C-alpha cells in the first residue's frame, strides 16, 4: 500500500510540474514588448539588426525611421541612447562600426564624388550636452564627411544562439546576459517558446521543442526557467519567466530544431553509411537531386555523417519523396547546408534521380581495407539532431506507460484486499447453530413445579416430556389393543389428557365453592355444541388419567378425549350410580412404578385403586381410567353431558397441600 501511495505521489508530481510561471507582464527590464515599442516611438530612436534590442544600428524617427550618420556622433550620445532604452549605462558601451557591406543602398565606401547627390541619415544631434536623451538635439544634416553608420552595443546587451547542433538553426538554447552565456531550463518549454528563438535567429519556424539531454549539457549559469512565450515576441528575453539558477540543472537544458535546419540520412543500404541520400528540411524528408551530385558533394556528406570518405556514387532510383534538394559544393565545407543549395527547383532537378553514395565506413568495405576506416563508428544515420532527438510524444508515451503500470498495481492491490476481507469474514462470522430439541427448565429432575400455569397454552409452547420407567411384564395390564412402547432414549410422546387438565385448571376458591364448570376441550368442541342433553348412558364416565397407585386425585368430568383426537363421553344416568364402598385395589400403573398425584380443581380425592376391568388404553398407548364417582349427589346440571361438568371434591386430609405430580422420573 505504501508503495502504491509513493508511486501515485511521484506521478502527481511529474504531471503537475513546478509552480506556474511568473505573471505575463513580468520580464527583465520591467516592460513588455508593446511597452518597449511605445518607448522607442516616444523617444524616436531604436537599435535594429542586432542580436537584441540593446545592440544594433541606430535609427531615428523623423518622417520615417532613418539610420544615423556617424559624422556628428559622440560618446555622450551613445550613453544617452543606452540609458533611454534601459540597456545599461555608459560604463560598458562600445562603438562598433559596421563594414561597408552593411551601408544603406546607394552608399559606397570611398566614393566621394557622389556625396552631393546622396541624402544620408540625419544626425540625432550634433552634440549631446549630457547623458540624458532630452539634452540631445536632432539635426537634419547630410553626412558629407563621414558616410559610415553608427553601431552601438550597450552594456546590457542580450543575445541568443543554438549550439552543439549540426547547424546554426538547431541545438541547445543559450542566452547572453550580463556578458556571460547561459542556458534555458526546459520547464514549460514548448513550440511557442522555440518559435521565438527560431524567428530571432532567422531560421524559419520551430519544428521541434526539445527537452533536456537531447544535446550535450551546457555549462555556466542558467538564465531562464519556466519561459512562457506567446509566440509573437521579438526576443526570447521579452517572454515572461523566472531566474533558472534555483530549481534547474544542466540536464534540463532546452533545445530547438528550426525549419531551416538541415539533417541527412542514408537509406536502403546495408548500414547507415550506404544508401539513398535524404535531407530533413522544413519539417519533411526530401531526396537529393543527382543532376549535380559529384565527388565533392559526396565527400562533404560522408565526412559530416562520420562515415569517412566517399568511395562510390551508384546510380539512384527515381524520386520517391515529395521534396527535392539541389547542392553545389567545393569539397571543403563542413556540411551540405553551408554549400550553395536550392529547394524544389524544377529547373535544376527536372531530369534527375535520387542521389546515392557509398562511404568508406560502410560494412561493405571494412573487410577490404583498414586504411580508410573512419576514426569513429557512426551512431546515427543522419545528423545528430533529428535522429537522436525525441519530442514530447515520447514523454507522453512514458507517462502513459507509467499510468498503465500504476493502474495494474491498483487493481492487484484491490483484489488482494478483497481476498483478505473474505477470508476474515469466513473466519469470524460462523453460522449460529440453534438446538430446537433441548428445552431449558429451571427445575431439577424429580421436583414438582408449582408455578402458575396459564389458562391457554400457546401452540408454539414447548412440550413437556415425561420419561416413564420401564414397567415389569407382570405389572402391566391392558386390553387386546395395547401397543407396547419402545422405552428408548428418545423422549416419549406427550400425554394429551395431561395438557388438557393443565389448560383447564381451576383455582382453589372455585374448588371450595364446588361450583365451577370445566370449559370444553378443544378436541371435543364439535360435540360440546349440542343443544340437547343426551340420553342416559349406563356406561361409567371415562377418565384419561392412568392408575398410579392407591391414592390419586380424580378429575370428575364426564367429557374426555383420546390422544387420537376422538372425543368420547361417559354419560351417567339421571341419578348418579351408587358408590362402591369397596376401595380400589392397588395396582401399579403399566407406565410408571410410582403413581402420580393429579390435582383436580384444587381438591384432593383419595381412592384405593381402580378395578382391573376399569382400566384400558387407547391405540396410541395412552392410558385412561374408568372409575365410579363417590356417593355424592351433585346438582343434576353438573352431570349434563356433553355440557361442562361440575367437580366433585372429597376432603380426606385438611392439612394435605394441593399438589400436582407431573411424574418426574
From Swiss-Prot:
Ranges in the topological domain labelled Cytoplasmic: 420-665
The name this protein goes by in its record: T-cell differentiation antigen CD6
GO biological process entries: acute inflammatory response to antigenic stimulus; heterophilic cell-cell adhesion via plasma membrane cell adhesion molecules; immunological synapse formation; lipopolysaccharide-mediated signaling pathway; positive regulation of cytokine production involved in inflammatory response; positive regulation of T cell proliferation; response to lipopolysaccharide
Residue intervals annotated with topology Extracellular: 17-398
Region annotated Disordered, chain positions: 536-665
Annotated ranges, domain SRCR: 45-155, 160-259, 264-360
Biological source species: Mus musculus (Mouse)
Known tissue expression: Expressed predominantly in thymus, lymph node and spleen.
Compartments (UniProt record): Cell membrane
Upper classification of the organism: Eukaryota, Metazoa, Chordata, Craniata, Vertebrata
InterPro entries, per database record: SRCR (IPR001190), SRCR-like_dom_sf (IPR036772)
Residues carrying a glycan: 29, 34, 49, 111, 117, 228, 344, 367
GO CC entries: cell surface; immunological synapse; plasma membrane; T cell receptor complex
SUPFAM superfamilies in alphabetical order: SRCR-like
Amino acid at each position: 500500500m505504501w508503495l502504491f501511495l509513493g508511486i501515485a505521489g511521484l506521478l502527481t508530481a511529474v504531471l503537475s510540474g513546478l509552480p506556474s510561471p511568473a505573471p505575463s507582464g513580468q520580464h527583465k527590464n520591467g516592460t513588455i514588448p508593446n511597452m518597449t515599442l511605445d518607448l522607442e516611438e516616444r523617444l524616436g530612436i531604436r537599435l535594429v539588426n542586432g542580436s537584441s534590442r540593446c545592440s544594433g544600428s541606430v535609427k531615428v524617427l523623423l518622417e520615417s525611421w532613418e539610420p544615423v550618420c556617424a559624422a556628428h556622433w559622440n560618446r555622450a550620445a551613445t550613453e544617452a541612447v543606452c540609458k533611454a532604452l534601459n540597456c545599461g549605462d555608459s560604463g560598458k558601451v562600445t562603438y562598433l562600426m559596421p563594414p561597408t557591406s552593411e551601408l544603406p543602398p546607394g552608399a559606397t565606401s570611398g566614393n566621394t564624388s557622389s556625396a552631393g547627390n546622396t541624402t544620408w541619415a540625419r544626425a540625432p544631434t550634433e552634440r549631446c550636452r549630457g547623458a540624458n536623451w532630452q539634452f540631445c538635439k536632432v539635426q537634419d544634416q547630410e553626412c558629407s564627411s563621414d558616410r559610415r553608420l553608427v553601431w552601438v552595443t550597450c552594456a546590457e546587451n542580450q543575445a541568443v544562439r543554438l549550439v552543439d547542433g549540426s547547424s546554426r538553426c538547431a541545438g541547445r538554447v543559450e542566452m547572453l546576459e550580463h556578458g556571460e552565456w547561459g542556458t534555458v531550463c526546459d520547464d514549460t518549454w514548448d513550440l511557442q517558446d522555440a518559435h521565438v528563438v527560431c524567428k530571432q535567429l532567422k531560421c524559419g519556424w520551430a519544428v521541434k521543442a526539445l527537452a533536456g539531454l537531447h544535446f550535450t549539457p551546457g555549462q555556466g549559469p542558467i538564465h531562464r526557467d519556466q519561459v512562457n512565450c506567446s509566440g509573437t515576441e521579438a526576443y526570447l528575453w521579452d517572454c515572461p519567466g523566472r531566474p533558472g539558477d534555483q530549481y534547474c540543472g544542466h540536464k534540463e537544458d532546452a533545445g530547438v530544431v528550426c525549419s531551416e535546419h538541415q539533417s541527412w540520412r542514408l537509406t536502403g543500404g546495408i548500414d547507415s553509411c550506404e544508401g539513398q541520400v535524404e535531407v530533413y528540411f522544413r519539417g519533411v524528408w526530401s531526396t537529393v537531386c543527382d543532376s549535380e551530385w559529384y565527388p565533392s558533394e559526396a565527400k562533404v556528406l560522408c565526412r559530416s555523417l562520420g562515415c569517412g570518405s566517399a568511395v562510390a556514387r551508384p546510380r539512384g532510383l527515381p524520386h520517391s519523396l515529395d521534396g527535392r534538394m539541389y547542392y553545389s559544393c567545393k569539397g571543403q565545407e563542413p556540411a551540405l547546408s553551408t554549400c550553395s543549395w536550392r529547394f524544389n527547383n524544377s529547373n535544376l532537378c527536372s531530369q534527375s534521380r535520387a542521389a546515392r553514395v557509398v562511404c568508406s565506413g560502410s560494412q561493405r568495405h571494412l573487410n577490404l581495407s583498414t586504411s580508410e576506416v573512419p576514426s569513429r563508428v557512426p551512431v546515427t544515420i543522419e545528423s545528430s539532431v533529428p535522429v537522436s532527438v525525441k519530442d514530447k510524444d515520447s514523454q507522453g508515451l512514458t507517462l502513459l506507460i507509467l499510468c498503465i503500470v500504476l493502474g495494474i498495481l491498483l487493481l492487484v492491490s484491490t483484489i488482494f484486499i478483497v481476498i483478505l476481507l473474505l477470508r476474515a469474514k469466513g473466519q469470524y462470522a460462523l453460522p449460529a447453530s440453534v438446538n430446537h430439541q433441548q428445552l431449558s427448565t429451571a427445575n431439577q429432575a424429580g421436583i414438582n413445579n408449582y408455578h402458575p400455569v396459564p389458562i391457554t397454552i400457546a401452540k408454539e409452547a414447548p412440550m413437556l416430556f415425561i420419561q416413564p420407567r420401564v414397567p415389569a411384564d407382570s405389572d402391566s395390564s391392558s386390553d387386546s389393543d395395547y401397543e407396547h412402547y419402545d422405552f428408548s432414549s428418545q423422549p416419549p410422546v406427550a400425554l394429551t389428557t395431561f395438557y388438557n387438565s393443565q389448560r383447564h385448571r381451576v383455582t382453589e376458591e372455585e374448588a371450595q365453592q364446588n361450583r365451577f364448570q370445566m370449559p370444553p376441550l378443544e378436541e371435543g368442541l364439535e360435540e360440546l355444541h349440542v343443544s340437547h342433553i343426551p340420553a342416559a348412558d349406563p356406561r361409567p364416565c371415562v377418565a384419561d388419567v392412568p392408575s398410579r397407585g392407591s391414592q390419586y386425585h380424580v378429575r370428575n368430568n364426564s367429557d374426555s378425549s383420546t390422544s387420537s383426537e376422538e372425543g368420547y363421553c361417559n354419560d351417567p344416568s339421571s341419578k348418579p350410580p351408587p358408590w362402591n364402598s369397596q376401595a380400589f385395589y392397588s395396582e401399579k400403573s403399566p407406565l410408571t412404578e410410582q403413581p402420580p398425584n393429579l390435582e383436580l380443581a384444587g381438591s384432593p380425592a383419595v381412592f384405593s385403586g381402580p378395578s382391573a376391568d376399569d382400566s384400558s388404553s387407547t391405540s396410541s398407548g395412552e392410558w385412561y381410567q374408568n372409575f365410579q364417582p363417590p356417593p355424592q349427589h351433585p346438582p343434576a346440571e353438573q352431570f349434563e353431558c356433553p355440557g361442562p361438568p361440575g367437580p366433585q371434591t372429597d376432603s380426606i386430609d385438611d392439612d394435605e397441600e394441593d399438589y400436582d405430580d407431573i411424574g418426574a422420573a
